Each structure stands twice: as C-alpha cells, then as structure tokens.
UniProtKB/Swiss-Prot annotation:
Disulfide bonds: none annotated. It is a multi-pass membrane protein. Pathway: Porphyrin-containing compound metabolism; heme A biosynthesis; heme A from heme O: step 1/1. Its cofactor is heme b. PANTHER family: CYTOCHROME C OXIDASE ASSEMBLY PROTEIN COX15, CYTOCHROME C OXIDASE ASSEMBLY PROTEIN COX15 HOMOLOG. This is Heme A synthase. Heme binds at H246, H305. GO terms for cellular component: plasma membrane. One of its GO terms (molecular function) is metal ion binding. It catalyses: Fe(II)-heme o + 2 A + H2O = Fe(II)-heme a + 2 AH2.
Length: 325
C-alpha cells in the first residue's frame, strides 16, 4: 500500500467515524455501553447471559431510568450494537493509522514536516479516544444526556484530525505569483468552519434543532427574546441562543464565501474555480441545514449535513497546499 493510499484509507475511516457517530447520537445509542475497555471491549456479548449482563448495567444508568425505561431487550441490542460498531471503527482506525505510521517511519523517506504532522495526528487520535469516553461518562452520572460541551469538543477533535491528514494527503500545487490570497481564504474559512462545527456540536448536544423549527425566522422572530436574557457565556447553555448563533454563523460564512467569489473574478481561473467550489458547497450545506431544521432532524439529511461540513473543511485545507513556484 502506498503512502497516499494509506492516508486516504485513514481519512475515509474518519469520515465513517463521523457518520456512525452522528447516527449513534441521533438514535440515542451512545450511552448503551457503560464501560470503556479499549482492548477487551473489542469482543461483543456472545451469549444470552452476556447480553443480559450488559442490559442490567444499562438499567442502572440515568438514561434508562428517565427516558428508556420501557426499552425492550431487542431494542437494547440494537442501540448497543450501534455504539459497539462506532467504537470498533475507532479501534480499526487507530490500528490502521499506528501500523502505517510505524511502517512509513521505518521504510518511507518522509520529510521532517510530514513526520511531525503524523506524530501530531497520533497524539490527536489518542486524545480523541479519551475525549470520546469523557463525553460518554458525562451521561452516566446524573443527567440522562452527554455534556454538550464534551460533544462539541469530541466533534472538534475529529475535525482537527481530519484537517491534518487531508493536508498531508494533498499534493502541493505550484502556481506563478503570490499565494497570499489562497492562504488568506483557506485559513479564514477553516477557522470560521471550525467555530461553526463547534456550534453545531452544541446544537446537537442540546437538541436545539428541535426548538424553533422554522426558517428564516425563529418562531416568528429574527431575534428571539431568549437571546437578550442570555448575553453572557451562559448563552451556550440555552438551546434557543445556541441555535441562533449557529444560524448567524451560517449566514456569515455564506456571505463571506459569496464575497470571495465576487472578488475571485479579478484573479486567475484556478483561484476562481476553487472559490466557486467552496461557495457552491457552502450554499448546499446551508440548504441541508435548513432541511434538517424544517423536517425535525431526519437522520439521513442530518448525517449528510454533518459530513458536508467535513468535506468543506477538506476543500478549505486545499487552499493551504498551494505554493509559489
């Protein structure tokens, strides 16, 4: 397997993890496994007795006592397997990345910068695993839901790992002239998209998408009254305020992309084409976001909305791989 093929496999596994993670959240499966066993946890329950033990552990959680007290044995098996599969793909990703890392460090003629990026990605991957359990643990104590802050952190770590590997995967593009405009647009949009992904994690954690399911107004108001009551850091605990911020951030991102598109017509064709791609994808992403809201978070559209955010990040990273020659 070549170096870039290995990176591509890792990137696809990250996207798979993001998709499965979103499905896990939307089906309320994430708290079904009450323990974190990085090694022995790879083996699922194989007997009826083992399944019953896992079910009994789940019955002691706040989620079961408050929300899922009527769940059947078969329904528990479903949500358990969803969470199990999410963790399994994470283990596969970690194994594939670590084996490839060792192999290419030994036999590959990697530049120092590539080695540093891969080591950073390894550290990020380890942190991401701990953050995942840190998030799940928050929903096993008193409240029957994970901390929305920890969920947002978990999603942000995934996006950061994704950006690092995409950057390493993409081959540098050499152009004539200055690359300032490329890097300015890429860095600006990457930063704003990262903030938007964090806000999206907060929206998901608070289930804020089920509140004010109207567009463009929020239950008849552009500025909901709730946001004026929460003009502090506490606004991140208020579902209405968080959804408002997520909407405004989406408007800002789309506006900036369209402004960049207009400005790009004064530059070369390659730059114009890349900006057009970003602007088009941003409009499509906003469209999926609106559909997710209006149809009360259907799983298929919600997952597409989440994956599109990562695809947009990947396109923005490509701006940083342009070099002057």
């Amino acid at each position: 397997m070549s170096y870039r093929t290995w990176l591509a496999v890792c990137i696809l596994l990250i996207l798979s993890m993001v998709s499965i993670g979103g499905f896990t959240r939307l089906t309320e499966s994430g708290l079904s496994i009450t323990e974190w066993k990085p090694v022995t946890g790879v083996i699922p329950p194989l007997s009826k007795n083992a399944w019953q033990k896992e079910f009994d552990k789940y019955k002691n959680t706040p989620e079961y006592k408050v929300r899922h007290f009527s769940i059947s044995y078969a329904e528990f098996q479903f949500i358990y397997l969803v969470e199990y599969f999410h963790r399994l793909v994470g283990r596969i990703l970690g194994l594939v990345f670590f084996i490839g890392l060792v192999y290419f460090f030994v036999v590959g003629n990697l530049a120092r910068e590539s080695r540093l990026r891969l080591c950073f990605a390894l550290v990020l991957g380890v942190i991401q695993g701990f953050v995942g359990w840190y998030m799940v643990k928050s929903g096993l104590l008193d409240v029957p839901a994970v901390s929305h802050y920890r969920l947002a952190l978990h999603l942000f770590c995934a996006s950061l790992l994704f950006m690092v590997l995409v950057y390493e995967f993409l081959s540098p593009t050499v152009i004539k002239g200055s690359v300032f405009k490329w890097h300015l647009v890429g860095c600006s949009l990457m930063f704003l998209l990262s903030m938007q992904i964090i806000l999206g994690g907060l929206v998901a954690g608070l289930k804020a998408g089920l509140i004010c399911s109207t567009f463009p107004l929020m239950n008849g108001e552009f500025f909901p009254a709730e946001i004026f009551h929460e003009l502090s850091l506490n606004c991140f605990n208020d579902p209405v305020a968080v959804q408002f911020l997520h909407r405004m951030s989406a408007f800002l991102l789309t506006f900036i992309c369209l402004v960049c598109l207009v400005i790009s017509f004064f530059y070369d064709r390659a730059f114009r084409a890349r900006v057009f791609l970003v602007a088009s994808m941003m409009l499509l992403q906003m469209f999926f976001g609106v559909l997710t809201l209006l149809f009360h978070i259907p799983i298929d559209i919600a997952l597409l909305h989440q994956i599109m955010a990562f695809i947009l990040l990947g396109i923005c990273v490509s701006f940083l791989r342009v070099r002057s020659g």
